[in-house]
Curated annotation (Swiss-Prot):
It is found in: Cytoplasm. It comes from Dinoroseobacter shibae (strain DSM 16493 / NCIMB 14021 / DFL 12). One of its GO terms (molecular function) is RNA binding. Disulfide bonds: none annotated. It catalyses: L-glutamate + ATP = L-glutamyl 5-phosphate + ADP. Substrate binds at S54, D141, N153. GO terms for biological process: L-proline biosynthetic process. Catalyzes the transfer of a phosphate group to glutamate to form L-glutamate 5-phosphate. This is Glutamate 5-kinase. Pathway: Amino-acid biosynthesis; L-proline biosynthesis; L-glutamate 5-semialdehyde from L-glutamate: step 1/2. SMART domains: PUA (SM00359). The gene is proB. The keyword Zinc-finger does not apply. Its main location: cytoplasm.
Length: 368
């Protein structure tokens, strides 16, 4: 069974119904302060934390006096634009006393489907975490029309977990897990402590959303669980309204854990190995030896580039004698790779005329 105390990189999804009081539209300050304490304690144990937070529309509509009913798309986008500033400031203010630097990252589901944007987002999240920053991620509701209409922050949180290589994802919800039936209407409903596989029978147990401000129901949570599990990330659904919800989960609060069969890095490498390559990159003997020691591929070690590929595309890595070493996702196009082959990373900007990544294929984006 996965436990929160074992997390190496944790993603936490926070819904509008937890963050914003439904009646007044005001921020639940005491609850957020307690969450900040939880985050500080988890980080103190050496784990990275990413928060995926809804709430911009809910906060913005109060400022604009738009009431609590359903909003036309244009008003929802306007409310998101106004509320996003307040949401980011709220997190900054509660985490600053713990000496935690926050960053605002706005994404959409498309950032996980377009390979170039996927790699850029992944690199940004990785850099922020390496610098000790806690990213506050929200979908870009001002432009992401589909996400506003359907409310997919559960799936977005799962995609963020995949991009960050997280090993645990927690969905703070208005229920304490997955039940055999709706516990609000069926007194015989029982909660699952653990799910190892999402079967059609499990999917049939998903109900509809009941919260007034959030739109995600159990169906989107199961979709998130499938995405997370496929990437080797464990996921928990637990009731989030209680004070210090993450501490409560660590102390044994009721939850449903979705447990994967593999770890995030192994799952990612399996995915890369199955992709159809778009080109080939030949490396010299020094680079070949470095790759076998688990290093990333630098431009200096490249001797030949063939094929037409873009940033984020899969390529085959060849040894000097032409044998296949493995596959990886390139951070440069074929044209760029040809230009910088044999050059040191410090020379990339001079060659291309603009700054670039230090490595051509990162070791986490490579399978040998």
């Amino acid at each position: 069974m996965a436990t929160l105390s074992a997390a190496r990189c944790l993603v936490v999804k926070i819904g509008s119904a937890l963050l914003v009081d439904q009646a007044s539209g005001a921020l639940r300050q005491d609850w957020l302060t307690g969450l900040a304490q939880d985050v500080a304690e988890i980080r103190a144990r050496g784990a990275d934390v990413i928060l995926v937070s809804s709430g911009s529309i809910a906060l913005g509509r109060r400022v604009l006096g738009l009431g609590t009913g359903a909003l036309p798309l244009e008003q929802a986008q306007a409310a998101a634009a106004v509320g996003q500033i307040r949401l980011a400031r709220a997190y900054e203010e509660v985490l600053a006393p713990h000496k935690i630097t926050t960053a605002q990252v706005l994404v959409t589901l498309e950032d996980s489907t377009d390979r170039r944007r996927y790699l850029n987002t992944r690199a940004t999240l990785g850099t922020l975490l390496s610098l000790g920053v806690t990213p506050i991620v929200n979908e870009n509701d001002t432009i992401a029309t589909d996400e506003i209409r359907y409310g997919d922050n559960d799936r977005l949180a799962a995609q963020v977990a995949v991009m960050a290589g997280a090993d645990q994802l927690v969905l703070l919800s208005d229920v304490d897990g997955l039940y055999t039936a709706n516990p609000a209407t069926d007194p015989t409903a029982t909660r699952f402590d653990r799910v190892d596989e999402i079967t059609p029978e499990i999917e049939a147990m998903a109900g509809d959303a009941v919260s007034g401000l959030s739109k995600g129901g159990m169906k989107t949570k199961l979709m998130a669980a499938r995405t997370a599990m496929d990437a080797g990330c464990a996921m928990a659904i637990t009731e989030g309204a209680r004070p210090r919800p993450l501490k409560a989960l660590m102390d044994g609060a009721p939850a449903t854990w979705f447990v994967p069969r593999t770890d995030p890095l192994a799952a990612r490498k399996h995915w890369i190995a199955a992709m159809k390559p778009r080109g080939e990159i030949t490396v010299d003997a020094g680079a070949c030896a470095a790759l076998k020691r688990g290093k990333s591929l630098l431009p200096a070690g490249i001797t030949e580039v063939s094929g037409a590929f873009g940033r984020g595309d899969p390529v085959i890595i060849l040894a000097p004698d032409g044998t296949a070493l493995g596959r990886g996702l390139t951070r440069y196009t074929a044209v760029e790779a040809r230009a910088i082959r044999g050059h040191r990373s410090a020379e990339i900007e001079a060659v291309l005329g603009y700054p670039g990544r230090a490595v051509l294929i990162h070791r986490d984006d490579m399978v040998l």
